């Protein structure tokens, strides 16, 4: 075991897979020589060579097309889109081509592509860098969408993503890259895609979240417990597919649920979770399912995001309203 940041854990996972399977290739803008904008791939090109870890032109659609071509010819590509907001430039390749390859080929051609990309607020980026587009990607049939909330999950989920025979979008929250460390095994391990994690057990209310909002939810739970409430916190880990069974089991116990997301409220992951819980656990509910989310506006850039992003205070206020309903 070693203490790692999320950057280090992701780098370690990539290194592990490059060693394990010579068909794994890592590429994207500035991924090779510079080790990526956030130095996530630092040192990999030097260790594994330019044929396996390499830079691409600044053309997201080309990166996606290259990944698909490599995948259907036997490779296991790990492509990086420099920031999630740039996925608009490669959306056809990702959702219209890569995601549909197995279906189009009648199951004869898998597309084992891992699409890595940073996203999320809290680091004051320019426009189109921090956008939360996980809801759009989760609505694209054929894609799995994974969002780790810390270093341990980051390594295990990335290894599972790379070894998957279907395409996985692996979203890395920028605020979490170096914000804290966790004990991470140095050997290979996998975390199942599609399985949520109960981060904290409780009996009065369930907070459901993913990515950086998991940390905010845990902070909120700590404050709520000072007021005598027992709070369960669940990390989705994967927003496509969603582990509804774990969520239903929790809500059947607590009777109350608040879904927390950083993204805009409209048509988000939180709306899907709320709908599923309403369909499957409504008789167990003692209060309406609540959501904490950002405003339905274009993602603000730099300092403006400070008043836009949901935070611990918002979660506490909504949780108390739900508890007192």
Curated annotation (Swiss-Prot):
Keywords: Oxidoreductase, Pyruvate, Thiamine pyrophosphate. Thiamine diphosphate binds at residue 60. One of its GO terms (molecular function) is pyruvate dehydrogenase (acetyl-transferring) activity. InterPro entries: THDP-binding, Transketo_C/PFOR_II, Transketolase-like_Pyr-bd, Transketolase_C. It comes from the Bacteria. Signal peptide: none annotated. Heterodimer of an alpha and a beta chain. The gene is pdhB. SMART domains: Transket_pyr. It is an enzyme of class 1 (oxidoreductase). Its EC number is 1.2.4.1. It holds the Pfam family Transket_pyr. This is Pyruvate dehydrogenase E1 component subunit beta. Coiled coil: none annotated. Its cofactor is thiamine diphosphate. Gene3D superfamilies: 3.40.50.920, 3.40.50.970. It catalyses: N(6)-[(R)-lipoyl]-L-lysyl-[protein] + pyruvate + H(+) = N(6)-[(R)-S(8)-acetyldihydrolipoyl]-L-lysyl-[protein] + CO2.
């Amino acid at each position: 075991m070693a203490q790692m940041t999320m950057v280090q854990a992701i780098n370690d996972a990539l290194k592990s897979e490059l060693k394990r399977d010579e068909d794994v290739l890592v590429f994207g803008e500035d991924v090779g020589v510079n080790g990526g904008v956030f130095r996530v791939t630092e040192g990999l090109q030097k260790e594994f060579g330019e044929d396996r870890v390499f830079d691409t032109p600044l053309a997201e659609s080309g990166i996606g097309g290259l990944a698909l071509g490599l995948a259907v010819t036997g490779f296991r590509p790990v492509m990086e889109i420099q920031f999630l907001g740039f996925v608009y430039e490669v959306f056809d390749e990702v959702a219209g081509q890569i995601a549909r390859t197995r279906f189009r080929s009648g199951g004869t051609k898998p597309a084992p592509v891992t699409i890595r990309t940073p996203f999320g607020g809290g680091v004051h980026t320019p426009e189109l860098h921090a956008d939360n587009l996980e809801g759009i990607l989760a609505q694209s049939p054929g894609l799995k969408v994974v969002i780790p909330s810390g270093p341990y999950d980051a390594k295990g989920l990335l290894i599972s993503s790379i070894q998957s025979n279907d395409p996985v979008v692996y979203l890395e929250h920028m605020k979490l890259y170096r914000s804290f460390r966790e004990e991470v095994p140095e050997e290979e391990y996998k975390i199942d895609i599609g399985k949520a994690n109960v981060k904290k057990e409780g009996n009065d209310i369930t907070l459901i979240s993913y990515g950086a909002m998991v940390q905010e939810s845990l902070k909120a739970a700590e404050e709520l417990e000072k007021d005598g409430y027992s709070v369960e916190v669940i990390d989705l880990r994967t927003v496509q597919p969603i582990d509804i069974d774990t969520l239903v089991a929790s809500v059947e116990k607590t009777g109350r649920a608040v879904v927390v997301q950083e993204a805009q409220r409209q048509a988000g992951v939180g709306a899907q979770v709320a709908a599923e819980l309403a369909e499957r656990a409504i008789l167990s509910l003692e209060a309406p399912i609540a959501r904490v989310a950002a405003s339905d506006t274009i993602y603000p850039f730099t300092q403006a995001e400070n008043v836009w992003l949901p935070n611990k205070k918002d979660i506490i206020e909504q949780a108390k309203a739900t508890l007192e309903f």
